[in-house]
């Protein structure tokens, strides 16, 4: 019994060789891949990750739903990148690639537009007017709940300043527009974000990039004047004030010279005039001229988003419209004068006949034959040349 116990104890003791030689395994040990901890800040549009030691290469890019790739420039020692010209409301995928002297790292980050589909603001648009004011409008999403509320945020291209809407336009208590009377914080290109909130469900956001040159609506030209001489008319106007800093070469104008009292359906030809230092247009118009009106509108020569028409300026005279009427009046007056003259002559002729009636002809009572000539031409009975009249005597004897 003692021998059995002793043998069992000896079997449980570790083998001396096991204590001196480390255990070897046939399976290769693989270290778990460390995460780059990629993160994205939508306010600054900055994508960042944890820096790795001995980095030899790194890049970042995004892919949208249309498989378009945007890759900003990045140096090897940077651990972040910033995206400037992107919209996120359709959902994007960020991806970071980093290589070190020992291994490579890759990580993706999905950035979806969380919330119920169709709850985001729709039909978003903005326009600048009067050089200092801007209106933005949008519509409620078709699947948005009744208690939805939208909020507008604007960031300039440098992402250094965020503008919140100061004055909202409401429809049944829901924000559907925004009015801004101070545009000092805007740059040439700006990022617009419309967020939504609701107690019932999540609301998707909408974002857009807008260029101030494309959304500005010019005021019509001012100080429009027209001066005419006997043969020409000269139109002058003043360049409209704009939010952008533009020279006269950046403008294109259209003139609508319209003649008054024309037949309905008559189309007027629009006259295109390039911007000029003096802003003038000279066209032939001889006197007498009918009454006309002229109005002008302006646009950026690169975009041609036309302004409204200026107030119509009239020139010419209503008497000018009688140019063609004069002909008809002269014809009528001439006809009347001729009629009066003819009537006067006719009456005078009647008076003359009354004063000097015609002498009646002597009637031939012996011969009622009307075929006999009333007038005898004695020349027909001229004697023969060299002969005189001969008298013949006829003697009549009475026989018993």
Swiss-Prot record:
One Gene Ontology term of the molecular function aspect: growth hormone receptor activity
Residues in compartment: Cytoplasmic: 347-400
Extracellular side: 23-320
UniProt keyword annotation of Disulfide bond present: yes
SUPFAM superfamilies tied to this protein: Fibronectin type III (SSF49265)
Signal peptide bounds: 1-22
Record has Ion transport as a keyword: no
PANTHER family named among the record's database cross-references: CYTOKINE RECEPTOR, INTERLEUKIN 5 RECEPTOR SUBUNIT ALPHA
Other notes: The gene coding for this protein is located in the pseudoautosomal region 1 (PAR1) of X and Y chromosomes.
Stated name of the protein: Granulocyte-macrophage colony-stimulating factor receptor subunit alpha
